């Protein structure tokens, strides 16, 4: 309760870190604090939440996700506050390479942490809705890319956020030499669906740095 109250006021200073450390000592796990802060982000705002995420990552992991390149999944997982989860078998046919998913918030607005191994990316796709809809990505670890059809790729790092309106053809995934994780947040809408399209070809992807 104290952690959420301080975050909502933007008081992510040394006192906030003290309360995070106390929460950890009292048995709050990394997965639990990630879920708590994500829930609170919808009320306190993502800028305040991101400051809290960074401090929680220091307390629970002590690592730096951006410093992990093409190492093991286990090593990378220790550098991010959100769980990696399980292999994304249900959507594997829409990805090149291995991805993983971990539900963070299941009630209200669903939030899923998606992790991509180095070189992994999803196919071009479009989020559809008759009203509203779309998706928001909040990057939480590693290095990746987002690209809209007809535009240049955008390099992504921890703390970056991308708003994807319904009807926009796009893809996202890891850089060739780095793991990458983002929260995928479904924007509420009517008759939401996703249309999966062609893969991002190796020649096209190889142009990325």
Where are the predicted features?
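Hydrophobic alpha-helical segments
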Residues: 2-75, 209
């Amino acid at each position: 309760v104290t952690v959420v109250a301080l975050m909502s006021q933007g008081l992510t200073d040394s006192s906030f870190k003290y309360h995070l450390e106390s929460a950890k000592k009292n048995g709050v796990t990394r997965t639990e604090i990630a879920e708590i802060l994500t829930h609170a982000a919808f009320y306190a705002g993502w800028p305040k939440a991101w400051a809290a995420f960074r401090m929680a990552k220091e307390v629970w992991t002590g690592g730096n996700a951006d410093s992990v390149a093409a190492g093991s999944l286990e090593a990378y997982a220790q550098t991010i506050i959100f769980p990696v989860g399980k292999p994304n078998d249900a959507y594997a046919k829409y990805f090149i390479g291995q991805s993983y998913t971990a539900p963070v918030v299941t009630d209200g607005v669903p939030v899923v942490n998606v992790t991509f191994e180095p070189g992994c990316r999803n196919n071009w796709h479009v989020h559809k809705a008759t009203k509203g809809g779309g998706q928001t990505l909040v990057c939480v670890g590693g290095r990746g890319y987002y690209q809209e059809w007809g535009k240049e790729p955008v390099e992504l790092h921890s703390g970056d956020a991308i708003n994807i309106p319904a009807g926009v053809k796009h893809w996202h995934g890891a850089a060739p030499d780095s793991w990458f994780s983002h929260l995928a947040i479904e924007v509420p809408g009517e008759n939401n669906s996703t249309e999966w399209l062609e893969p991002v070809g190796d020649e096209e992807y190889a142009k990325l740095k």
